[in-house]
Design a protein with these regions (language model features):
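N-terminal accessory/interface modules of nucleic-acid-binding and processing proteins
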Residues: 1-294
Length: 294
């Protein structure tokens, strides 16, 4: 048995690392990744266009944490499907020669000295499908089906849904009332894209209220806009009307750790809404298939 550790990609002529040297190498690697997260957090809140680009990345990579989305945005923002070298190999997919790996954080469970469970994070090297000879999924069509999205969003709403002729803001097609725990949708709005945008944003308010100990529509307004933007982006609905052209001073002035916490709340609410919508759309698709078979 040896106490020597060899780097994953060590060449035949490279010296082995001692246990201490290997640990130091991994510590430095992790430190570099955390610095990359902090730098990306500062960068996106300094420029609305960069913030929007980050939201585009997070909307595609909805299963990844905000911290990992920041890492992906910083290294390979156009990513759509990530796997490590071994997992691509299991699918008989080869990495393109010269492709640069993307560093993300992978949670690892461990047992503390007192016997309680804990979670630490290791740096994991992954590659996007575009860095391989694998097939890339087709891009989402613009305005794919806003009416279907509206129906699914209302069907899976975590709060009551009610139709109304008037809303507090005339230019809105939907409004979440936290006191009544109800999502109101305006009748006879002909523009299905506008309705989809409003419903997605107001669902963001509803989900943020559910996920938070306290709720303020004013304080959470920008987060709800971001959620609506990401949901519409994910389902191919136009996003130009979402007001992400100005970063709130309260967010821009925060420290990187605080920015990441806000992004995490936004990402978690978006991912929860998307999960319910996706499940509902799949269920309806299955029903249509059964009807067709009959």
């Amino acid at each position: 048995m040896t106490n020597d550790f060899k780097p994953a990609k060590a060449g035949g002529n490279q010296p082995r690392l001692s246990k201490e040297e290997y640990a130091e190498k991994k510590r430095a690697e992790k430190e570099k990744v955390y610095q990359m997260i902090d730098d990306a957090a500062r960068e996106i809140v300094s420029d609305p266009e960069k913030f929007k680009n980050f939201l585009d990345t997070q909307s595609r990579m909805d299963r990844y944490s905000a911290a990992n989305a920041l890492l992906i945005y910083s290294q390979y923002p156009q990513a759509t499907q990530l796997k490590d070298f071994d997992d691509w190999g299991k699918d008989n997919v080869k990495i393109t020669k010269g492709a640069k790996s993307i560093s993300i954080l992978e949670p690892v469970e461990y047992t503390r000295a007192d016997g309680s469970p804990g979670i630490s994070y290791n740096v994991k090297k992954v590659f996007d499908v575009t860095q391989t000879n694998g097939r890339k999924a087709p891009a989402v069509s613009a305005n794919r089906d806003p009416k279907a999205l509206i129906t699914s969003m209302l069907d899976v709403s975590p709060v009551e849904v009610a139709a109304t002729d008037e809303l507090p803001y005339p230019n809105m097609a939907a409004f979440y009332n936290n006191e009544k725990q109800t999502l109101y949708v305006k009748r006879n709005v002909g523009d299905s894209v506008a309705v989809a945008q409003c419903v997605a944003q107001e669902l963001g308010h509803a989900q943020l209220s559910i996920n938070s100990e306290s709720y303020s529509r004013r304080d959470m307004g920008f987060q709800a806009v971001c959620i609506g933007y990401m949901i519409c982006k994910k389902y191919g609905v136009d996003t130009q009307n979402f007001a992400i052209n100005r970063i709130p001073e309260g967010l821009a002035s925060k420290e990187p750790k605080e920015i990441r916490a806000e992004l995490s709340k936004t990402r978690n609410a978006m991912a929860e809404i998307h999960s319910h919508i996706s499940d509902e759309m799949f269920r309806k698709k299955q029903e249509r298939s059964k009807d067709y078979e009959r």
